[in-house]
Amino acid sequence: MNDKKTSVRTLTMLALLVAMSIVFSRVLSISTGFVRFNLGSLPVLLAAVVFGPGAGFAVGAVADIIGGVLAGYAINPLITLGAGAIGLVAGFAWQKLNRLSTNLRLAASVLLGHFVGSIVITSLALRLFYGYPWATLAVRIPNALILSAVNVVLLRILLENRSLMKLAKK
């Protein structure tokens, strides 16, 4: 019975993180055409660090699908894969880099997640499906670096919140 309660609690927390990701990426977003500045990956990264790589992938992919449907976009599986890969890669990196200090571990996990998910996979999808030129896609690199830095700072604050961590670990 305790496993069922934990499972329901975990699913509820992940669903809240999906909702937060949708709001952060679709509503609280600054768009410049081909680059969007938003914190939609923050809940994805939080899920990856707290609940593991599978949860990070699920939150990223589900938030991308639901957010795309709500915005009226056609679902692009490669872009959805990129959104999920941010959480998957960050979660695996967080687990494997456990000998590093927390700050360095967090920075490396977030940077690797954004590099694979946003810079590589999503940029490739934008090039293949929508014909974006590589030169235009290069602007995504500083965007990912800035968002990674902001995400690291915010994640560090969230991970130090005892109430949040107690709620997540129950």
Regions flagged by a language model, labelled:
Residues 1-170:
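Loop-helix junctions at membrane interfaces
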